[in-house]
């Protein structure tokens, strides 16, 4: 019985090693919803991300900040709405949304530092306004226009974990 358990564990480790070899130096993008930060599982998620990084994969983290943005906008008594799952963002809300996005990114960076990983929060995303679509004015809500590929590659090649706040410039 014990031999069977040991064999299953050894087979599982061999399978993992095959994947590590196959994906070594590949880039993996991980989205972390900000609700995980308050979860008891947050630390283990961070440890798993660090393990992926240590296995030779290049990790990019893209945290969501919906919960934190909602908290801050509510505390400041700011109105907002959604259309087709996209927050309609007024110009007045942008500083608060930036604050929320960087708060979430900073918490993730701090957790990674606690695991001896160096992360960098950056503005590698150029965005543009969505404009008016089907009669809906998305105001300051935008979409990705361009990524600064060379800068991102430099950060990854130097062994850092880039964190992309959910806001573009």
Language-model-detected regions and their locations in the chain:
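Nucleotide/pyrophosphate-binding catalytic subdomain
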Residues: 1-169
């Amino acid at each position: 019985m014990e031999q069977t358990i040991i064999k299953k564990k050894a087979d599982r480790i061999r399978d993992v090693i095959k994947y590590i070899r196959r994906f070594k130096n590949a880039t993996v993008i991980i989205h972390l919803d900000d609700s995980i930060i308050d979860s008891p599982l947050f630390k283990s998620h961070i440890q798993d991300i660090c393990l992926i990084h240590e296995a030779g994969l290049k990790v990019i983290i893209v945290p969501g900040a919906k919960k934190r943005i909602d908290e801050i906008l509510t505390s400041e008594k700011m109105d907002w709405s959604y259309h087709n799952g996209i927050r309609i963002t007024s110009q007045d809300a942008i500083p608060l949304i930036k604050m929320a996005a960087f708060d979430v990114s900073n918490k993730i960076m701090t957790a990674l530092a606690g695991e001896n990983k160096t992360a960098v929060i950056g503005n590698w995303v150029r965005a543009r306004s969505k404009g008016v679509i089907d009669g809906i004015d998305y105001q300051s809500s935008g979409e990705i226009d361009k990524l600064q590929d060379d800068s991102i590659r430099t950060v990854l090649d130097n062994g850092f974990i880039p964190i992309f706040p959910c806001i573009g410039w």
